[in-house]
């Protein structure tokens, strides 16, 4: 059985590598398609993948994209390639995208254009409004609408998918994938250290006093 992971950002690598390793351990034929949004950081994370898999660069880029101009240029180059080229590797195969980034959107377009089975990992995240947290909210909604399989956790996320009237199959898991990702950094179970890690990378977390 073949499964493809279409990734571009450092967060996508961090949160999908445990799933990739699990797929490899279960003798699936894994292909990682790199969209190169954060190639410098991705290079440091790829060595966390254990076992045999196929790695494909979908576009050439050596540097992490950190400006709007660079992101727009990269996005347009990807769109042109997707529109005018075909990739038979996706056809009828499970193809995973993660989250709500531009890489998620581009990955979904790539998969659907080539008749793959689109799997959205971490589906049904909060939706404050289509343009309130743009483009994240836009990506969350439209990728969910076109996904064949939606992997999610929690009643809030499932209710959100119900509100969107998604057509794909909703698969509930027990917890967010970030818990599995903690194993990648080999955290020690040491209660003597008064330290805590807090993730506030989402726009709505940064802007919300409640969060």
Predicted regions: what is each one?
Residues 3, 28-31, 53, 116-118, ...:
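Hydrophobic anchor at the start of a short beta-strand
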Residues 47-51, 135-140, 168-169, 188-192:
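Short, hinge-like loop/turn segments at secondary-structure boundaries
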Residues 28-78, 84:
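Conserved nucleotide-sugar phosphate-binding/catalytic loop shared by glycosyltransferases and other
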Residues 39-40, 144-209:
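A nucleotide-sugar donor-handling region in carbohydrate enzymes
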Residues 1, 93, 194:
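Nucleotide donor/acceptor-binding cores
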Residues 4-6, 13-24, 61-166:
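Active-site and donor-binding regions of nucleotide-sugar-utilizing enzymes
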Residues 8-9, 34-37, 123, 201:
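Cofactor-binding loop segments of dinucleotide-utilizing enzymes, especially the Rossmann-like FAD-
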Residues 5, 31-34, 120, 198:
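Structural beta-sheet core signal
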